[in-house]
Structure formats: structure tokens, C-alpha cells
């Protein structure tokens, strides 16, 4: 575990600036350095289907996608990229293309011939499951490292010769057995998986590398990228740019909120150089959401500075801030209570009921609430904490919510105070505001900060309450409805995932305490839905495998029977409730 006081992931956690990185050229596009944050997406087709792949690539470029990724699961698919690229360029489209490779090093070498960038997965480029976790030893771990250098060095040399870029793309769901043996199923395992491959690039003096550490859990993704930034400093490696995303985010508002909670938090930390919002929708729908998220989380050069004591804080492993409970409107907030969701008292009067809100906030000037409106208020408290009685509910409503609440928590810790913190956000009905609030709250609860949430500003107050609950669920802080983990679809997907996602939501959406993964294939599916209670995974054309946790329990089910078989499985486990 790293010591934050000696090896931080950013220079100042109270003043966000974009991380300085190497600049990577991908065709005509630039990633990192002083280049704008690049938006990318992925086609749902295989290169062998040339017409559809070209059409989707052109459609993505038309809506402003800065880089298009195409999966190439086989050597034949990688070879098919030649014709795809010819037609894309013949259409006058200059958007750079990246090939996405799993399990097939030969396909990766072939793809280098035709596209500007190739993504490889350290979890399966060399370590393809020859040894199971039970068979791993310290000796096999070291031998595996030698095999990585032996296999990956020629690939790096070829990329360097051709002027291509490489993405070392780690997925939480597909860590190798070697890494899990040494580090466990942890963010450390994700980071060291990337570091191992990056060491080969460094040895070859090749710096046209982008790094990614993705997970379907925003908390895991945030922690992993932070830790990677710190480890690069510790290893004295170059500061390579980061491609940031939350895998399997889902569809609709839930997918957007989960993406904002994870990607937005990293944008606010200055750690993102290119992003993809992974939605179980048409790929074209991802691009405007990503563009809006970048705008919403834009770092401001004139953002205020927070002058507070800086205390040791581990930003790489989740731990909720310890607080004492405070009672507000008859409801306990803080301590061992879940993060509460409230609404303003005047909104309660307007609607005549609290709806699903757990408490009514009488006002930011009503005891025990203590409102700080700007950085000077926090600095004043830090200088004289005894002026505010213990057992208060603190709230920061000034600019830069994330930095302000971090500073407030640091000031409370310096004074040895454990008063709870209310996260209060003002919002309009715009998507930009919604994404920003999700990023703010997602970042803070990932840091273990916040004991209650009030979102204010919607015309219909109950929408504010619903949004607060949805953000807490997106950030894996509190569950209030069925949690769906679904992949965005690509050329590896074995069924119509958008259609199936809709059917599963309709059939299982009433199960509040259940988490269900809907995955198109076996590459990342079983791992990325590791947090799910049950899983629906493509096992072959027209065939589905059902999972309970990480275990496949029903295989080779005809697709037309799979949803009802999932109902039966949940019933067998005593988790089913009638709607």
C-alpha cells in the first residue's frame, strides 16, 4: 500500500490541474500533452463484415468521435482491417482507428499493418489460462514475467518501426491468474499488470503508449487510475496518458450516471486524456454524452485555492470517513447509518409529502446545519474549530464542490472532529448539470466523504430525490433498485444485447436487492460482472450461459429460454419476489 504523504497521485488534491503527460500520436489525432481530451467509441461489428464496420466508423466520425475502436477477435478479422481502412479513407474520413485484441498476439501483429493503434489486454496477451490460479507459484509468476518480455518485445519493436501507438488496456474482469495469485483481485493487480507490460516499452525506448485500467465498478476504476499515476512516479517511468472509462455501464440514465461517477471523478482529478462512455446503446449515442461530460468537468484555471492542513489520506483503498451520528428532523445522519437522501423542507411543503426522501432539510441556516459558502469559511473554521459546536452537520455550498468538501474533511480531521458532512448540490434540468453532480458526488463518496445528499433545483422535487438515490447506486455507495451491469456490445457479442437488456430490465426490474450482469461474450463478461449476483452471458451463437456470482451454473441454454431459466435460478436461490 502506498503512503499518500510521500507518493501522491497528484501534486495538490485541493487544486485540480490536468496531469502532464507524454503526447501520443494516433494518425492525425493527439492524445495527452496539451491536446484536448479525445472522445472515442467502438463499433459493434467485426472487420469481416466490411460494409457494416465501415458504415459504423463513418457514422461515429460524423458525430465527432475522435478515435474509433474495432474488435478483431481472430487473425482473419485483423486481416479484414485492410479493406475496412481502404474504404474508410476512400470516403474521405481521416478518423484514426484502433484494433481491440484479446487472446491473439498474431492478430495484434496483423492489425499493426493496417490501423494507427492497437489495444492489447495484459490479462490474455501471454497469460491465457494455461495455469489455473491453484497451480500458480512464485516460480511460475517469475517465469511468466519472462514470457511477457519474450512475447511483447517484438510487438513493441514492430509498432515502433511502423509508427503505431499501443494501448495497454487492463480490464478488472480479465486479470491473469498470475496477477491474481500475486496481488489478489485488487487494484494493485490491475496496476502491476499494466506496469509489467509498460516496462517492456520503457526498455525499448518506446513512449507512444496509452494506458487504461477499466472496471464496471466506478470505485475500483477511480482507485486504479490514481494508483497507476502514483506508481509511474515511483518507478520513474514517463507520465503516459490515460484512456479512461467505466466498462459495462449499462443503458439510459443509469449508464450515463455510472459513467459520470467514474469518468467524471477522474476528469476532476485531471487524470483523463481520452475517454469512452460505454453504453448498451447505438455507439453513436455514446459520443455526445462523452462530449458533454468533458464540458461538465472542465478544470478551471481560476478555481479557488483551499488553504487547509493536509493530513495523511489513502486515496487508493475505500474507507468511509468515521463520523458521529447527528439527528436532523428526527433522522440520524452519520455514524453507521447509510448515506441518507433528503429534500428541502419547502419542497416537501410543495409536494405535500417527502416521496422517497428520508429527511427534510429545514434550511442551510437551521441547526445543526453549518454552511460554508466559500474557501475562506473553511479556512476560518480550520483556524478556530471550537467556534462551531460539536455534533454539527457541515455543508459546503461554494465553488468546486469536490475540492471544497475534501478541504472541509481535512479541516475537520485536523481538529479531531468527526461531525458528519452533507453533500448539497444545486442543479438545473440540463444533462450537463446532471453529469457534473454525478461526477462530484461520485468522487466524494468514493473517498468515503458524505453522510447525506440533498440535490436542489429540479422543477419536480421528487426527481431530485430519485437522482440522488441513482447517483449513490451508480457510485456503488447504496443500492435502491435492481443493479444492471451490461456491456456496450462489440463484434464479439453473440446476441442482440440491446433487445435482451430491455427484456431483462422489464422482467427483473422490481428486484431491489439483486444485481444482474448482461454480457455479450466470455472475454470480459464473467470477470466484469464479478460484483453481480447473477449473470446472463453469451456462450455461443444462440446459446446462453447463466452465472451465479463468478460460477457458471447453467450452460448451453437456447437464447429463447434463457430469461425464464434465469427466473428459475433466482427462485431456486430464494431471491425471487413477485412484482
What are these model-derived regions, one by one?
Residues 2-41, 156, 160-162, 299-348, ...:
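N-terminal amphipathic alpha-helix/helix-capping segment at the start of soluble metabolic enzymes
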Residues 34-52, 97-104, 179-191, 247-257, ...:
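Active-site mouth loops of central-metabolism enzymes
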Residues 37-43, 68-70, 97-101, 118-120, ...:
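Hydrophobic faces of well-ordered beta-strands that scaffold small-molecule active sites
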Residues 44, 63-88, 122-143, 209-218, ...:
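Glycine-rich, proline-tolerant flexible connector loops at the mouths of alpha/beta enzymes
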Residues 65-69, 115-132, 268-284, 394, ...:
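Glycine-rich phosphate-binding active-site loops on the catalytic face of alpha/beta enzymes
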Residues 72-114, 348-351:
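N-terminal active-site wall of soluble small-molecule enzyme domains
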Residues 94-132, 138-158, 163:
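Hydrophobic or amphipathic alpha-helical targeting/insertion segments
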Residues 136-152, 157, 179-323, 328, ...:
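Catalytic alpha/beta core domains of metabolic enzymes, predominantly
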